[in-house]
């Protein structure tokens, strides 16, 4: 039986891999081991997701603090050890965070095939760590697993073999559908004194300049039909 080693470490990517083990059990022709790199360790950024989704990491790394470069180095070393001991047929990574880059580099050094979901995206903003990660590990020699049909042509325009680009869908939506009933029954809106049609809060990534990001967020939200009455307030929109 084939084995996939799925590596995640941050809040957004926890949500994207919740169905992987269930799919493996249903198919019966491959197994999944889950690695939590510890990039996000706060209870509200990590533990709560594993508890609510019923996930149990098979490997949990403890990475020392330090500079971003030092942490990336520790991640690569720790993930190399896990890959050696697990001996998977392929390593699966998601997105463009440091855990993704570290796992990709470790897998490449060990000549283990890499499955990269949400790969091949670019936004041209080199002030973002995520964009630097995308550029650092260019995937020209491996398949790309895309989650957005409208952007599948971008890697080909940069020289990627079109036959290596595969649309696989958005695994975060798989999680949304699977937990839809629990979401509807949740009392969290009441706990936070919010209503489905009331104000919403958007938390942007801290990279880049706030002025540029605020313009982009405003343009994106205002372009939606449901946001025709969008108002911006400096009381609620501020850089952190």
Task: State each model region's role.
Residues 231-240:
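Catalytic donor nucleotide-activated moiety binding site of glycosyltransferases and closely related
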Residues 28-71, 78:
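Conserved nucleotide-sugar phosphate-binding/catalytic loop shared by glycosyltransferases and other
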Residues 1-36, 228:
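N-terminal phosphate-binding or glycine-rich loops at protein starts, especially the Walker A/P-loop
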């Amino acid at each position: 039986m084939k084995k996939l080693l799925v590596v995640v470490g941050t809040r957004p990517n926890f949500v994207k891999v919740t169905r992987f083990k269930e799919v493996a059990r249903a198919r019966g022709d491959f197994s999944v081991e889950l690695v939590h790199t510890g990039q996000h360790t706060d209870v509200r950024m990590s533990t709560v997701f594993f508890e609510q989704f019923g996930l149990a990491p098979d490997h949990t790394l403890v990475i020392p603090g330090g500079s971003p470069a030092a942490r990336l180095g520790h991640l690569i070393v720790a993930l190399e050890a896990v890959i050696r001991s697990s001996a998977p047929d392929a390593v699966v990574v998601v997105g463009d965070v440091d855990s993704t880059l570290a796992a990709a580099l470790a897998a490449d050094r060990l000549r283990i095939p890499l499955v990269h979901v949400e790969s091949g995206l670019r936004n041209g903003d080199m002030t973002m760590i995520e964009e630097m990660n995308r550029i650092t590990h260019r995937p020209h020699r491996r398949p790309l697993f895309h989650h957005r049909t409208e952007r599948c042509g971008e890697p080909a325009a940069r020289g990627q073999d079109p036959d290596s680009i595969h649309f696989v869908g958005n695994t975060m939506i798989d999680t949304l559908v699977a937990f839809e009933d629990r979401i509807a029954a949740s009392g969290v809106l009441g706990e936070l004194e919010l209503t489905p049609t009331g104000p919403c809060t958007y938390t942007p990534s801290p990279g880049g300049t706030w002025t540029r990001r605020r313009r982009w967020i405003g343009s994106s939200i205002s372009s939606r039909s449901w946001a025709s009455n969008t108002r911006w307030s400096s009381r609620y929109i501020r850089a952190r």
